[in-house]
Amino acid sequence: MKIIKTCLIDGEELELADEMIILELNNTGRGFVTVRTEKDCIGKSAVFEMGEYDHYYKWFDGIVEREQSAENGYKKLFIREKVAVFEKPLNCSHRHITLRDLCAWITSQTKIPVKVPQADYADTPISLFTHNGSGYQLLANIGRQYQIADYMWQQSPDGSLFVGSHKDSRWAGKNIEFDESMTLTSGSNDMTIPITAAIRPGAIINGNKIQKVELSGDDYVLSRENLGKDGKPEQKSPERRQMEKTFPELAGGYHLPKYAKVVGIADPSSGGDISDPFRPKYAVELQLLDENGNEDKTVPVYPAAPLPVTSTGSQGGDFAFPEVGTMVEVGFAYGRSDQPFVRTMLAQGKTVPSVAPGEQLKQQRPEVFERTDAAGNKIRETDQKITDKSFERHIETDSEVKQIGTSNVAIDSDKTETIGGNKTVSVLGSINDMTASNRTVGTGGTLQEKIVGLAQRVSDEKNKFVAPLSYMGTEAQNIFRLLEDTIQLLGEVASTLATHTHRGSPPPDQASTFNQQANKAKTIKGKLTPIIE
């Protein structure tokens, strides 16, 4: 049947002289049409319809980007589909966003309706979606970031944009068996058939996905891809094969950092060992992960990947082996597969401690950590033992508070304490104070001892008390004052004995002796009285 072609520019049907249009999967349709017109067409809508009387389709919907004059009042117009707007930058940064919400945002930015199928990947949020580049690059990244198998995007004839898996598209389950006898020409990856407007990129012809459709006059050229069971091309493009031959690191992805999981510790150092490529000594065994975080079992375990060190020297630096299961970032020096090394360690899959903005935390486990808060306060805590050893130690602080359960201090040599203020010691139990040599206690003020129970001092040699004034006894009685009174009494007794008589008898023969004793008692009292309080 006769093929009908119609070209509408800004809604006006124009006489069509020639056309060459390409529709491509995951790309913008574009091409040239030659029409009779004298009007300015740049920026106006361009619609191309094609088909038979009973099967007539809107085949292309776009805009005119450029024009040039042709012969006899014709113009040659360069047209592109509406999704050409994605050529411009489309930067974004979204957290915890679903594909459906992302496509709604794309619609708000480009004014192009984006259709998303009813599938799990459309409503499952991902951790982060960021992009800095063109809209084409954004559309290409959607498939990887949302882990969409056999991903595709395509402008529909109505001007909307489909984003999703090919198995969820309009082409899924519609394999068209095309008899080779009906083809005009056929190659390894393309065929030329009579114009069939219903066949567009994405259609499955004889089990192969059509990647590109070219319309040039009466030729309808289909470019196909041979796909595997996973929906991916079975062969690499010639351009990619040439690049990977010239740059082998591109084939293995060694120019990009990769994720890996620690599966073991390799060659731990016993101290003083030299680290070299044969025995890194500070290294781990790694299992590479694919870009979706799954173990890549096609790659054997890397036996000894060196770990990073923040600062290092001979037998010096910061060292800590990650626990098995830790996710790390792996780089390859110079793009060489034989020189993997761990760039950094990540906390993914691990429970994370509480860290406030401005804080610094170094933690082995919740009971063992060293924390510095935003104000500069430092906390060091462990449920085990802290051992400090140094030749000399200096501590300087304005205030110190200690709360200790049990304390034992052993000092091999001398200890000196110099206190600029007061010292207070409160003990709920007993104090045992012993020295193998002498003890000297000095005070520039008053020395007071308050004892509730028995006060006992035992000396193997003697006790000596020296003071200008002395007081001993109770609050009411001073023993020394009683001693003074006793001496006074002895003196008075001696004086009485020196002068006493018995009913007119003469004084005693020992009167002079008694007088001497009375004078002696007076002298002793005179020495005692000044030193009694």
Curated annotation (Swiss-Prot):
SUPFAM superfamilies linked: gp5 N-terminal domain-like, Phage fibre proteins
Superkingdom of source: Viruses
Protein name: Uncharacterized 58.7 kDa protein in lys 3'region
Classification lineage: Viruses, Duplodnaviria, Heunggongvirae, Uroviricota, Caudoviricetes
